[in-house]
């Protein structure tokens, strides 16, 4: 019997892929520190919201990222709260992603990630939505590089991995499963 190739759950373009990020998610993470030879796990509530790059927040982040007015910029706010993880120290935070699609290739473009905290550096890099329907983010600041891969197992289950490299070796890896709690507000 001839093996059957798995049916693609989604056939999304980049904008549809990013739009599917929006909403409230329960995120479960398993991570490993190569430097400390230590594994861990955590869970948190994650909220992803899209912002207009022309708002005051959008203009402020563009300025911090060193970008001029970019009409095609897609700006996402990702906030997390690990209060759902009983027995762990509580952490809340917010990070922003800015995606600037390539005019000739809509499945790739420039990327930056940062916060409104002026003491923390923005990471810059690129992204690519592959034919395997996996979004790869490559970010760095010179000595540290971060590679994240995001994909959907179903409309309400997003999976992702991250790998941090410092110098010649890897320092940290993580696997996340994100279960949608609420779709984005209409």
UniProtKB/Swiss-Prot annotation:
A Pfam family this chain is assigned to: CpeS
Keywords: Lyase
E.C. code: 4.-.-.-
GO molecular function, one term: lyase activity
Keyword Lyase set for record: yes
InterPro entries found in the cross-reference section: Calycin, CpcS/CpeS
Keyword Lyase belongs to the record: yes
Family affiliation: Belongs to the CpcS/CpeS biliprotein lyase family.
HAMAP family: Chrphore_lyase_CpxS
Function comment: Covalently attaches a chromophore to Cys residue(s) of phycobiliproteins.
Record's protein name: Chromophore lyase CpcS/CpeS 1
Organism: Synechocystis sp. (strain ATCC 27184 / PCC 6803 / Kazusa)
Gene, per the UniProt record: cpcS1
């Amino acid at each position: 019997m001839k093996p059957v190739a798995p049916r693609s759950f989604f056939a999304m373009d980049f904008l549809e892929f990013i739009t599917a990020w929006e909403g409230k998610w329960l995120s479960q993470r398993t991570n490993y520190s190569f430097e400390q030879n230590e594994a861990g796990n955590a869970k948190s509530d994650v909220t992803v919201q899209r912002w207009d790059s022309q708002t005051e927040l959008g203009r402020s982040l563009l300025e911090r990222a060193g970008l001029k007015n970019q009409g095609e910029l897609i700006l996402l706010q990702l906030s997390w709260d690990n209060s759902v993880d009983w027995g762990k120290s509580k952490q809340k935070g917010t990070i922003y992603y800015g995606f600037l699609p390539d005019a000739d290739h809509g499945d790739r473009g420039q990327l930056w990630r940062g916060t409104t905290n002026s003491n923390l550096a923005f990471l810059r890099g690129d992204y690519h939505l592959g034919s395997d329907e996996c979004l790869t983010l490559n970010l760095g600041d010179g000595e540290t590089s971060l590679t994240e891969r995001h994909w959907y197992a179903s409309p309400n289950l997003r999976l992702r991995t991250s790998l941090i490299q410092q110098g010649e070796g890897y320092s940290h890896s993580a696997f996340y499963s994100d279960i949608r709690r609420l779709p984005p507000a209409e």
